[in-house]
């Protein structure tokens, strides 16, 4: 027997360039999967960041929290809240994203709600905070509240509203408190908002995603009112009243 055939030839592994290419592809796929988990496409499902919050609500879900004798919170849909360490006896939370109505019922240290780059403080008050984009909106519904951003502060009386973002704290304005409060009664009311704003709001309460592709239609200002539980009926209203064409796709995409 030929000695050269005593042992089968050893198999050679993939070349270094091929191995590096494989590892690079695997790492890219892993990174892509992680990105999808953190930022789901079209927000079709909750992200991993949603599950890190102390308190959260899903799509169309609302929740009430009694965090202390002096702090009661009602959370709206798609909202995340974290508890923060108390400062000198204060009850403190952070609105990470979404919308919440806060009732402060203490006579001592204030309730503090952090949101974005600012904070809202109150002792005896009821106020609404909305943080669904780059801007935070604070509306005072009862009592008075202090809204602070960097070194600036605005004191709001009942019926006043102020917004702030990364650029600064803006001047207070008169608020439509009925519209601000509407979500607590299960309705959504629009009076002169653009159709794009209406669709954004529908997406907060409806599973799936509504995509508005017509720029002229998106800029059109509308007046409408509908129940939170009837978002599909709202889409039919947009079709019948404003000429929107609806195309339904799997996964609740319209």
Regions found by a protein language model. Give the residues of each.
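N-terminal intrinsically disordered, acidic low-complexity segments at the extreme N-terminus
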Residues: 1-8
């Amino acid at each position: 027997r030929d000695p050269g055939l005593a042992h089968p030839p050893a198999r050679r592994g993939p070349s270094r360039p091929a191995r590096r290419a494989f590892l690079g592809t695997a790492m890219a796929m892993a990174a892509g999967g992680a990105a999808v988990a953190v930022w789901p496409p079209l927000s079709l499902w909750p992200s991993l960041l949603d599950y890190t919050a102390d308190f959260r609500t899903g799509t169309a879900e609302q929740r009430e929290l009694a965090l202390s004798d002096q702090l009661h919170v009602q959370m709206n849909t798609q909202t995340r809240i974290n508890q923060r360490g108390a400062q000198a006896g204060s009850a403190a939370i952070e609105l990470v994203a979404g919308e919440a109505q806060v009732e402060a019922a203490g006579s001592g240290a204030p309730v503090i709600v952090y949101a974005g780059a600012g904070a809202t403080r109150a002792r005896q008050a009821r106020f609404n905070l909305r943080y669904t984009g780059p801007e935070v909106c604070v509306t005072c519904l009862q009592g008075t509240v202090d809204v602070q951003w960097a070194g600036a502060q605005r004191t709001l009386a009942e019926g006043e509203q102020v917004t702030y973002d990364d650029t600064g704290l803006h001047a207070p304005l008169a608020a439509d408190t009925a519209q601000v409060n509407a979500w607590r009664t299960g309705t959504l009311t629009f009076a002169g908002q653009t159709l794009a704003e209406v669709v954004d709001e529908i997406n907060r309460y409806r599973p799936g995603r509504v995509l508005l592709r017509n720029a002229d239609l998106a800029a059109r200002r509308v007046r409408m009112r509908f129940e939170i539980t009837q978002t599909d009926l709202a889409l039919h209203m947009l079709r019948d009243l404003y000429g929107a064409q609806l195309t339904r796709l799997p996964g609740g995409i319209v």
